[in-house]
Amino acid sequence: MKRSLQNKRQYSVELDEEGYPIEPQLEDESEYEPQETPRKKKSLLRKLIIRLIAVGLVVLLIELGILLWSGQIWFNEPKKKDFPVRFPVIDSDCGEVYWSKFGGQNIQACYIRATKSTNHVDERFEKNWADSRKSGLPIGALHIFDLSADGKAQAENFLSAAGDMTGRLVPAVEISPNILERIFSPGVNEIGANLRDFVNAVKEKVGVTPIIKCSSAAYDKYIKGEFSDCMIWYESLYSQPDNDVDWTFWEYTSRMQLESFEKQGRRLHMSVYRYGEDEFNKLIIGKIPN
């Protein structure tokens, strides 16, 4: 049995048989749903735009990361007009090199890792050294310096492997020790003396002073102020070398990809020469005044 109560304001409420209020039934509840205001619509649109921008930025960063990882771009890459001569360093990890095609890849030279310490010779150096003439590029040989080994003995190993360097680029020696090598290596003076012995032995045999390739840490610790007679091949992967470094070569990336290799996808160390092509050609042995 339904009853109605009426208050002083003439507001009636229907009660059920137990005396509880009965909620009124709406004919079409959708008519009573709150309608979106223009301000709310603008807020939703703004949120949608922000989300789309955020997604776009994430996709862009992922694509940029892939390009950097693959070596297709590098944020520190020097401009071609400023540094027209650029070249990679290769070793046996590249597998066979197709030298006849190698030179047509916007590179002007190449260095080949030849030896390390007193007895190690790169397993593909002899073939690469001979076949590299097919590229038509100036080619140089690189020795990896062992901080704990005798400098003269290292020079003998390098010179024996490289042989006659007439028509080749000035030879180079790399001193870029890792953390463990720096911890367990001899003192700075002994390392400097061994490196000096290497430099002098190569100069005496070849007639030119070798280039020293070094990391920034090695430069500060072993090279700076001690080897002013040597050209410097400086590694700086995130910015151009500091003004106080008198560099000749600058290694700007270790992730460059080139073709003409048996093992595709190999990432290479890439460097530039500080000056123009005419000056660079003077680094070919036989064209340098002794």
Where are the regions that the model predicts?
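Short, compositionally biased "basic patch" segments
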Residues: R39, E63-N76, G103
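Functionally critical loop-and-helix segments that line ligand-binding/catalytic clefts
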Residues: K2-S4, K8-D16, Y20-E29, N76-S92, ...
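Aromatic-lined carbohydrate-recognition surfaces of secreted/lumenal glycan-active proteins
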Residues: V206-D220
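Intrinsically disordered, low-complexity cytosolic tails and juxtamembrane linkers
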Residues: E18-I53
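Short, solvent-exposed loop/turn segments at secondary-structure junctions
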Residues: L180-R182, A218-K221
